Amino acid sequence: LAGNKFLSIKGMLNGTSNFIISQMENGMSFDESLSFAQENGYAEADPVYDIEGIDAAHKIAILSNIIFGSPLPPDNFLIEGISKITKEDIHIAEKLGFTVKHISSADIRDGKILMRSNPALVKKTDYLSSLKNVRNALVIDTDLVGKIHISSIGAGGEATAAGVISDIVHLASGLKSFNAQSREDLDYRDLTDEFFSYLVTVHSTNENTNNHIQKILEEHNISIINSGLINNVKQSYITYYYEI
């Protein structure tokens, strides 16, 4: 990797979040999935860092610093967790050909880094979509060897212990980053300069109301990628998926 230029890093960096989402895919509610994760030792008694995306955000910030030589992220670094995801969101994503994943990413745009850590829709055909339960994964895109996929168990006592021991050995050895001499120190892009799309679901049993909402959205150039009946309720799905 030392001879490569890094273009982006993206992945699922919190095993607890992925475990909870996997249980919700099997029909559990968010609260039930969180309790199940805690019972199995995959979530802390106070799970806020896991379920609000903070743990994953810390990890992508560290990875960005190692790979891109970037300083600490700015205040407008997008951080969102999974606590507001519902079973309905999971179901709708599945109907549209996606899975819901908590994705953390840092990629270079116009010589600056765009960083975020948030739930996203991932195509079912994507590598990350197939990884369930407590697995973490990272996709590193480079100019010479292309995309590199790394995956491992990301939650639980043994996985955590292995990570801590690895960090201690790394620090004790005084090892430097493999690209410390060749990397460029890059700054961050301002999120206010970026355009993002979102998934919005409109719940209505009134056809006229739903059509009126769709008309307003279309008048503002917000595209509809699908609409239909789910559980006898009219749904509209507004464009948003996270391109891995």
Stretches with model-predicted labels:
Residues 1-23:
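A contiguous active-site-proximal alpha/beta segment in oxidoreductase catalytic domains
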Residues 3-8, 113, 135-136, 144-147:
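Short coil/turn connectors at secondary-structure junctions
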Residues 11-18, 52-56, 154-167:
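Conserved phosphate/anionic-ligand binding catalytic regions in large, soluble enzymes, centered on
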Residues 23-24, 34-130, 135-137, 156:
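Substrate-binding/catalytic subdomain of NAD(P)-dependent oxidoreductase enzymes
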Residues 26, 120-123, 145-147, 154-157, ...:
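Short, glycine-/Ser/Thr-/acidic-enriched flexible segments
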Residues 29-32:
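Short, charged, surface-exposed loops that flank catalytic or proteolytic processing sites
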Residues 127-197, 201:
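ATP-dependent carboxylate/acyl-activation modules
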Residues 168-244:
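A conserved regulatory-domain signal marking ACT and ACT-like small-molecule sensing domains
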